[in-house]
Amino acid sequence: MDYKTSGVDIEAGYKSVELMKEYVKETMRAEVLGGLGGFSGAFSLAKIKEMEEPVLLSGTDGCGTKVKLAMVMDKHDTIGIDAVAMCVNDIACAGGEPLFFLDYIACGKNYPEKIAAIVKGVAEGCKQSDAALIGGETAEHPGLMPEEEYDLAGFAVGVCDKKDMITGENLAAGDVLIGMASTGVHSNGFSLVRKVFDITKESLDTYYDDLGTTLGEALLAPTRIYVKALKSIKNADVTVKACSHITGGGFYENIPRMLKEGTHAVVEKDSYPIPPIFAKLAKEGEIEEQMMYNTFNMGLGMVLAVDPADVDKTMDAIREAGDQPYVVGKIEAGEKGVTLC
């Protein structure tokens, strides 16, 4: 008996690494020391000496059950973008610059082409966020997971000067809320999504006029990465007072996380266009409006607060980065929380 007969194919692992090398190479930054295949990823921190008080920021996450759609559709080259986005957006909304990322893929069986496709998406997410992919792990779990299944997670590390951290401590009544458009459902709420829709290849390949695409393409659209938008805002000399990454828990859970005591966020629901996938979800699943806003991003992947005098500069900076901003509300004095009107 050998390792392969027990369900772990070492040769497939080697082939996976060879296939993914070209994608990983495209993410390299000057600070990366060494190459792929070492026992650890190494990243020089020499540049942060320019900061007064450098602070390392970290984020770890996965794609939830969205990976099930990728498996059913047999489309694996975008789900990695989601894994990166979930981590680097958290770092960015704290004021940080992502530095590097590492991924973890657990699978029932290592199919090299599939694993390489997943890493291709991870590398694309890293390129979109200017983070280096400095390592990762692909673990075969025979007997624990079905051969065709996998799960994907990762973590990112970033840095910022302490004085530039976005903390919400200077938030004040009268500040303006600006939302940045999402691509759709992003990476949260898919357990509910999978209860609403019949997740089969046939149903996911069905084209809907109201979506302008197939159901699968609408649901699998990669999570938008907002790193460059926030960097553009900083370069425009705008101080972001507070920022929230709208993920699991939707508006009701995530917007209050950016508020300080004594401040209340008011969001106008008709101030921006809501992607049609949400109306379809609500209708097909008979989901009440409050539950929709308490589960999904409802078209806004990130919400930030700025001084009224900085609104125009902020909107311009976001557009220059390729994202779509909307003025969606304001900050009022009151109990910490959010009101949708």
Which positions does each model-derived feature cover?
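N-terminal amphipathic/basic leader segments beginning at the initiator methionine
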Residues: 1-31
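Buried hydrophobic packing segments
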Residues: 16, 20, 42, 87-88, ...
